[in-house]
Amino acid sequence: MLAGRDFLSNLDMTSAELRAVMDTAHSMKAGEWRAVKPLSGLSLALVFEKASLRTRTTFDVGMYQLGGHAITLSNTEIGLGTRERVSDVARNLERWVDGVMGRVYLQQTLVELAQHARIPVINGLSDMLHPAQLLADYQTIEEEFGQDLRGKRVVYIGDGNNLANSHIHMGILTGTDVTVVTPVGYEPNAGVLMDAVKAGVEVHLTNDLDAIQGADVLYTDVWISMGQEAEADIRRRAFRGYQVTPEMLETISPDGIFLHCLPAHYGEETVPEATEHPKSRVFDQAENRLHAQKALLYHVLGDMKPRW
């Protein structure tokens, strides 16, 4: 299974492995693991190039609840690729801790960490992908629609960014029908789209807002990600009209739900009335970061024993 392996992309799992993680996440949320400490004596380094609320809190609390320990390292302390080579950071951390979670600017940084560390590396966010977030997203979706999600319409509206890319990967694994609604020039990564082609999975790309109608899941994310501030005005103009509002939520399936990974830039990709709408599951989704990532940590680190 996933024991001892890197998790840089949702496609680092098989569908069966994803099912095992999801089942564990649901049982953890139900309180069935409250007295179990499978990661006792293990440590996880949390490496941050980007600011974080949900990623830092949930991985830290998750390790604690499973009996392990997390240590947070900011980029001002480490200087990935500046103060020290990424490979040297990896070869140091592997001597002290049992795994690394990285929330970084570039996917290549995680690839380098994984290449040089003999311990598992987990993607907590990169410019390319956000796979840990998608575990929480799909836990939330399963809470609404059950385990068999084949044919459910997941419509992502906004920037074809790391979230859109990871939604495509999850569509490959789960059989959801993924549509990305985005302005011309802001489509998902070409390599990720090729992953779908190779898997024989059709991804629907459009700039037609009518594609939202009847969606089972409507998902959005910020128009301006960290590091894109210089493009803010251009992006706001490009995405005008792509804002999720309560009126838009009335056009999705009657049983449909609205998700946003947060933080929300209110007045841009959505408004407070949407995240507070009866169809919103945004804060359930945020809670599930804890349960889904605990499940991931258990499956990746759970077979390890303390070295000292």
Swiss-Prot record:
It catalyses: carbamoyl phosphate + L-ornithine = L-citrulline + phosphate + H(+). GO terms for biological process: arginine biosynthetic process via ornithine; citrulline biosynthetic process; L-arginine biosynthetic process. Pfam families: OTCace (PF00185), OTCace_N (PF02729). Gene3D superfamilies: Aspartate/ornithine carbamoyltransferase. L-ornithine binds at N162, D221, S225, M226. GO terms for molecular function: amino acid binding; ornithine carbamoyltransferase activity. Its EC number is 2.1.3.3. Keywords: Amino-acid biosynthesis, Arginine biosynthesis, Cytoplasm, Transferase. Reversibly catalyzes the transfer of the carbamoyl group from carbamoyl phosphate (CP) to the N(epsilon) atom of ornithine (ORN) to produce L-citrulline. Belongs to the aspartate/ornithine carbamoyltransferase superfamily. OTCase family. This is Ornithine carbamoyltransferase. It comes from Deinococcus radiodurans (strain ATCC 13939 / DSM 20539 / JCM 16871 / CCUG 27074 / LMG 4051 / NBRC 15346 / NCIMB 9279 / VKM B-1422 / R1). The gene is argF.
